[in-house]
């Protein structure tokens, strides 16, 4: 069957095929690099955390893309003005309790953040699922959210120092301020 082609034609075909393969591989590598840069820029430290958790950048990128797809389907919504005001009043009460009952206030702040997330359309679920979901819209808050939650739910929370509790409240305040101002993307 190849008898109809000259050696020069076969060599030209082989070279053309090799060039096409090289172009395809280079194109794929450029695509992957761009995707990695984009996800790293979008998710920040959460990207690095996903790589550590999943063992490879490829697996982490798949999981982060899955998060984005999941969150797009959640039906997130803005708070009504009355809801926003109710959450602000509740937050102020939690903050006021911190002076006399810091451990209780930190636990209440954690619960209030969870309630606020549900009001915004995020589903109830485990902390890790909530964290994964909100990392799509608020990746820069994740480190604060994880640290504050670790103190709020720590067994033996009584061992948390006043300074740790104060930092947790500040972290929750940062999260609260961002979430209560949420505007649907």
Model-derived features: where do they sit?
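Intrinsically disordered, low-complexity segments used for protein-protein interactions
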Residues: 2-3, 175
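Extracytoplasmic/periplasmic C-terminal soluble domains
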Residues: 150-185
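Residue-identity detector for glutamine
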Residues: 9, 92-95, 129, 171, ...
